[in-house]
Amino acid sequence: MKRTIALSLLAAGLTLGGSAMADAVVGQAAPAFKGVDAAGKPVSLDQYKGKYVVLEWVNPECPFVKKHYDSGNMPTTQKYAVDKGVVWLAVSTSADGDHAGKSAAINDWVKAKKAMPAATIMDTGGAIGKAYGARTTPHMYLIDPSGKLVYAGAIDSKPSANPGDIKGATNYMVQAIDESMAGKPLSQAVTKPYGCSVKYG
């Protein structure tokens, strides 16, 4: 009897977890969202309608994020995208609000790393992350001007925290932007993200 109850509770937990976390599907409309950035300004996906949009899940304390920022790889990728007219939005998902002054800290970090996001969205409570199924930092998404999700996954092909691996890696985001803008099918539209787990509480 106890085993039956335990299995029932486990099944219920899995069902609840599945309903809470929904993966955005490549080839379908990207989930709409509204949020507030680290400067306290409102941000929504709708305001960038008609443009390419990158979503990058970020955590400055994550070794995998540090790999791409300390090396300059992520800021360089951001500049490449922005120079092509792409809107780059960073997303910081957390379950514990802004009690530790995360907004101010992440603003300082963005400036120190010479990063180029149009905004860093403070996803307190994790609603945006859950809508997209964001699992790691970094976890990358590319949305085309029609609002369709065209890429979801890793920043590159080397799933490690070693900066030395960047040189020999395929930058999936650059590849996705180039191929999508050229009207080509993406070589890799979905890849496995790697990094630190996004914390939903």
Where on the chain are the PLM-derived regions?
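Short active-site neighborhood of thiol/selenol oxidoreductases, capturing the structured segment around
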Residues: 46-66, 177
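N-terminal signal peptide c-region/cleavage motif recognized by signal peptidases
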Residues: 12, 17-19
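Bacterial N-terminal signal peptides that target proteins for export
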Residues: 1-8
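Cleaved targeting-peptide boundary
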Residues: 19-30
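Thiol-/selenol-based redox modules, centered on thioredoxin-like
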Residues: 142-201
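Short, internal strand/loop/helix patches
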Residues: 107-150
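Structural microenvironment flanking redox-active thiols in thiol-disulfide oxidoreductases
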Residues: 66-113, 124-131
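A short beta-strand-turn-helix
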Residues: 33-53
